Regions:
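Double-stranded beta-helix
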Residues: 1-12, 142-148
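Active-site region of the double-stranded beta-helix
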Residues: 17-127, 144-148
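Histidine-centered metal-chelating micro-motifs
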Residues: 110, 130-131, 135-140
Length: 148
């Protein structure tokens, strides 16, 4: 299937095929070391030459016009650093009034959201579940299972 990036007319795409054709962002333990609280474990793994792949993102750049919706596929691998599960870096949107939807294709975990006042909400993630991140909330995924 040919992926069409004709944003002005809409498009349909197969997730797996499109994800393989896009440039990926790879986040390893080296990239994520400050995100984990067990810095002794991070140092031990680094000293042993271990730099596991934590997650990968394949994203499509939407036009910069108002109302455009970008989307992508994130593969969050299973694993732990000390007692913490692998997680994404997390972020606020540059335009704070932007929402986001996550649709879980496989695996299980939690979508952690937090607003600027410190209100934290945990949203369960499982195959077939859609999770809505409200505008103004930072968010990160945590893989609590054994599958990506």
């Amino acid at each position: 299937m040919q992926f069409s990036s004709e944003w002005s007319q809409g498009f349909s795409a197969q997730w797996a095929e499109c994800a393989q054709s896009r440039a990926r962002i790879h986040r390893t333990l080296h990239d994520m070391c400050a995100m984990f609280t067990d810095q002794d474990e991070v140092s031990r793994l680094a000293a042993g030459g271990q730099n596991p792949l934590i997650y990968e993102v394949s994203a499509w750049d939407a036009p910069s016009q108002s109302g455009a919706l970008s989307f992508g596929v994130t593969v969050l691998h299973p694993g732990q650093i000390g007692s913490e599960y692998y997680m994404t870096k997390g972020h606020y949107h540059v335009v704070r009034n932007t929402a986001e939807v996550y649709y879980t294709l496989s695996g299980e975990g939690v979508l952690v959201t937090e607003n600027e006042d410190g209100q934290c909400i945990l949203l369960p993630m499982a195959p077939g579940a859609a999770s809505y991140v409200a505008p103004g909330f930072a968010h990160r995924m945590v893989n609590t299972g054994s599958q990506p």
